[in-house]
């Protein structure tokens, strides 16, 4: 029985993953994923999260961003997380598993948020990549449009939004749409984001409501 060969790209990814200082640091500190360092760096620069805030985390699993947000907002705050994938419980985080494009799931998510409005909407959502840019980019842009639509539904005036976006077709139009809704918009590329990745993070503050 022959061993299944890894593709060159998957072999490279595996090597990068296990050599990655952020992966190793996350394990050492008991963090859910290396993604926590991205939101930590954004927080250090932009101070989006504060004690007592209500936060929605879209595409939350395995929970790195929720874990970080819960620590910052503290017992007086709330983190409501949603993902298609399961996520182990985190203290201070209310997790809903499901697809919020479905009415029943969206209503359940809104029920957990209301009657409050949300101070910060976070989205680290990404599609399952097919390795074909013409397929992957529209899927990725569709998800970030959903995240922006969530802002329109639940974000309080002067609230903030942080979203992972992949540069490519539709990116410039999306940035313009975010600028139409927020007073200040910045584009961040955290040190912990792999240099060859097309991902950047749009950080938007001062929701115009």
From Swiss-Prot:
It holds the Pfam family FtsJ. Keywords: Cytoplasm, Methyltransferase, rRNA processing, S-adenosyl-L-methionine, Transferase. It comes from the Bacteria. Its EC number is 2.1.1.166. Its main location: cytoplasm. It is an enzyme of class 2 (transferase). GO terms for molecular function: rRNA (uridine-2'-O-)-methyltransferase activity. S-adenosyl-L-methionine binds at residues 63, 65, 83, 99, 124. Disulfide bonds: none annotated. It catalyses: uridine(2552) in 23S rRNA + S-adenosyl-L-methionine = 2'-O-methyluridine(2552) in 23S rRNA + S-adenosyl-L-homocysteine + H(+). The active site is at 164 (proton acceptor). It is found in: Cytoplasm. One of its GO terms (cellular component) is cytoplasm. One of its GO terms (biological process) is RNA methylation. HAMAP family: RNA_methyltr_E. Specifically methylates the uridine in position 2552 of 23S rRNA at the 2'-O position of the ribose in the fully assembled 50S ribosomal subunit. Belongs to the class I-like SAM-binding methyltransferase superfamily. RNA methyltransferase RlmE family. This is Ribosomal RNA large subunit methyltransferase E. It comes from Vibrio cholerae serotype O1 (strain ATCC 39315 / El Tor Inaba N16961).
């Amino acid at each position: 029985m022959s061993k299944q060969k890894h593709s060159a790209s998957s072999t490279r990814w595996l090597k990068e993953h296990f050599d990655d200082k952020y992966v190793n640091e996350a394990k050492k500190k008991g963090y859910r994923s290396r993604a926590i360092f991205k939101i930590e760096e954004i927080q250090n620069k932009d101070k989006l999260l504060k004690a007592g805030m209500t936060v929605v985390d879209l595409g939350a699993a395995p929970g790195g961003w929720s874990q970080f947000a819960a620590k910052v907002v503290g017992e007086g705050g709330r983190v409501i997380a949603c993902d298609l994938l399961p996520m182990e419980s985190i203290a201070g985080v209310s997790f809903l598993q499901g697809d919020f494009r479905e009415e029943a799931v969206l209503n359940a998510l809104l029920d957990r948020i209301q009657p409050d409005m949300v101070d910060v909407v976070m989205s680290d959502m990404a599609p399952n990549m097919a390795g074909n840019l013409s397929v992957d980019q529209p899927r990725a842009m569709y998800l970030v449009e959903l995240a922006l639509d969530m802002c329109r539904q639940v974000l309080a005036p002067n609230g903030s939004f942080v979203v992972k976006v992949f540069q490519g077709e539709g990116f410039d139009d999306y940035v313009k749409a975010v600028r139409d809704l927020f007073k200040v918009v910045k584009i961040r590329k955290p040190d912990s984001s792999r240099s060859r990745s097309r991902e950047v993070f749009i950080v938007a503050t001062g929701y115009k409501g």
